[in-house]
Amino acid sequence: MVKVIKVIVPYIKITRPLNAAIVGCAVLLGMWLTGFATPAAYGGGAVARNAVLLVLAAMAATAYGNAINDVLDLETDRVSHPDRPLVTGAISTGAASLFAAALAALSIACAAAASLFHATAALIPLALLTMYSIYLKRTRLAGNIIVAALTAYALLFGSLPHPNTKILFAPALLAFLLNFCRELVKDVQDAEGDRAAGLTTSADLPRPAIRLLLLLAGGVHLAAMWVPSLVLGDFGMVYTGVCVAAVLPLHISWMMLALRTDFDKYTGRMGAMLKAEMVAGLAALAADKFIWTF
């Protein structure tokens, strides 16, 4: 039993289970917020069954992206993330590649079992994640934009093509802005390893430019945070209250660190705050829906 666990654990680690779980929650939340029920024209079936399938499809796609990224970023990770399974030798690159392919196939299969529409919709993140790992990660901003867009797409994926998906556009924009900032911070955090591997990323931009991008995106997010409830009226005061109590303090905290000229010393803390803010934002949407539903 112990040997089996030792074999399985590295495969779990390579998927970044927490990130995959957050994506799965975003998909499920999007479906719940819009009251989504898959029409017969798009495959039909029980709502609960389709919800499970689409959550699995999204989580498998996220896991695929992380696995294939580790395969192609092995040299970088030797410096930036020496504890990752491929670097430690817990998994071979061949085994990781096969595992990634299996995850991609699982994502498509689960989405197709829900509907043909979602089978097509699942191909988009898989294609973009592949492009990101092979090429876009090695660009100054394109890769950051793609990953941020895919995170926002997770909130929309489950509810498409339901017309109520429109209420998720503002939250998806917020998710995009927040994750764009997080990707910038991660690039700075991984700068040493990326340079050692000869890669060009957003971390190669001048530090004042990176700080400006963080503050601009963070500032727009701060202003837009209130749009879903106070401007559009798609969500209520519960959403606003959770944002004030949980989202806003985290947002201000990492932005204060971004203002520092030596902000690159605090990327670990900033990254943790940004991830916590993402979870808090999802919680704000969920709490509002829960209160007004029950």
PLM segments and residue spans:
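Multi-pass alpha-helical membrane architecture of UbiA-family
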Residues: 1-294
